[in-house]
């Protein structure tokens, strides 16, 4: 029989699926009584090419989509493009191509790659967030949420590159310098737009408990990011009457540990706190410190990594529990004005950051919480703070109380003294969505000198990006455009100015899953009836790197749109199930001069790796996730050209649990290719005239019955594995079944029927994984229509009962193989099974069987000579 040829089979079956719109979702209709199932992978950014690492995400979602379709569901499995973003502008600068042209060329290329991968996608619903037909509705959503008070504009700090004259994202600041210019970055305050996500902080936190089909790790990450915590607002009276008159009588601080107030040894203010700014005007040291901090990175990670630095402001405050106790006030680089009040009190014995700061500047360290089992006489704090619970001591009226009781008692005392109160605080801040970029969704407002900020009327949407822009200067092209920003005020008709900021691309990805439910809707972002039918997404698949921002913003948006009346979902949760897949990894390679090399540029020899173009030695580095920056990617098209799409799919699902990384190796790929051929040869080994693949060999007995039993057990196990997202387990079950079927050579019609039934089951259970090969097998077996239209088989419970034993088979005392037989099977039945085994037959070639010894349920020994 000929070998399986994916170059012929895969285009053939993809054309067949396209011809009948096989994967087009039906949606809500009176004639559709199928249950719905919405499966979605996080849509890609069209960066140019999809590599093998990317394919794992889409393949996993595709397995679920195809499986659910076979189980009788009406499946929505769409695809689109997260198409705005900075890389397109960088390409415009570096290559002289318009961002739109670059983006759409990439979309065309990547769409072709996904189609060649054989994904069961409903392409009729394809969207791209850079198309005006999409962002028109995003602008309408912006105006609706603005009307509801969920948007506001205020000044906020940004990273400003003084050479490129542009705002930089945090990741574009490297060691305090702009990534392109190398200039020292400074902090600037600009007017920015914010979504009031904080208004949903409690709801977003509480609802995490309901997401029982999300990974615990992701729920914990979101909970920590929102950071709801019970504590107290504490007021420290200023001792300087002049400052008190100018800035208020107290410096207010939020703390989660008011029980440690008696361990306080200092207050610290953010470098840009109003009091610090006022004092800096007359103190060069404070002024210098303030400006040095303005050049620091602003992410929590950067702040945490930076050495702790501060400056004594030369002022003091009174302790709220003792008016005779004065605490020095410092400014510290680890205090941020955007968090809380921009002020903290330092209790060094109970906080590592405070302890590091106190040791550096020789501030007092007073332990106030005694750990369990510790002694007050011997407990000391040296280089490590104690942050856990315990018993209060050195704390006057709190002495002897547990941490929980001391916290409540401290709040009661603060409230009695009118110097504080119990409060709940959140780490979450309102979502800054302004970007000083061209390639993004325009913000639909006009600035008028008389009327202020005026929304663009909805009948004038979309506000479309101008095409005639240049990228010869790094600043925002919209700001420099000679005419686009000029617009009349919709209220008074006077000359106004368009907003030249665009929206954060996370806004685009915060509602795209809703647009997929009715992408043809012209008057509304989506049809409420369709959204209510399809939502929530039943299974969402994507990387752990999106665990916080994207998923949190999407949860906020769904609630906000629900509350705005655009739909009436029972739950505000957009994703009922979430799976975060592992990466595909690969060795990394560096040339002798330190440049990253792709696998295609390296010759792996027994005596070491060399660069093909130079013959020079190559350094083989760590196995890391495939990334373009390190060039350790394997091109998807090249893989498909060599081995076929099904081999890609099978490889990325094999060996490793889907939540873990899987390593790309040439040997692993070759193993997959051999298995594909082995499976095909097993299917084509049936004799001509065999019955069709829906055969049920109900009368099978002996070896034929065991073949049926193996097939139904594999069916049951694969079904269970897919339902549990254990795709590697399903792959292993298929391997085992193929091995069993290869060894079985039927000797009569009952055996042929049993093997045909088993192969029919095999063709259907591999269809979600290797759909082209499954179609080819189904056709060869004589199946009617397409295998994707065949119902998922049901395992016969009677065949799942464990009533068989595995018997080792020896030939002349040497173990050759093993067979599975019914418990207590008669010796002649076991002997027939053994003699039909191909491995046994090969071992007996040229020999005469003299005796077959069957020890019931134990072992079989063949004596031959």
Curated annotation (Swiss-Prot):
One of its GO terms (cellular component) is cytosol. SUPFAM superfamilies: Anticodon-binding domain of a subclass of class I aminoacyl-tRNA synthetases, Nucleotidylyl transferase, ValRS/IleRS/LeuRS editing domain. Keywords: Aminoacyl-tRNA synthetase, ATP-binding, Cytoplasm, Ligase, Nucleotide-binding, Protein biosynthesis. CDD domains: Anticodon_Ia_Leu_BEm, LeuRS_core. GO terms for biological process: leucyl-tRNA aminoacylation. Its main location: cytoplasm. It is found in: Cytoplasm. InterPro entries: aa-tRNA-synth_I_CS, aa-tRNA-synth_Ia, Leu-tRNA-ligase, Leu_tRNA-synth_edit, M/V/L/I-tRNA-synth_anticd-bd, Methionyl/Leucyl_tRNA_Synth, Rossmann-like_a/b/a_fold, tRNAsynth_Ia_anticodon-bd. The keyword Cytoplasm applies. A motif ('HIGH' region) lies at residues 44-54. It comes from the Bacteria. HAMAP family: Leu_tRNA_synth_B. Belongs to the class-I aminoacyl-tRNA synthetase family. This is Leucine--tRNA ligase. It comes from Maricaulis maris (strain MCS10).
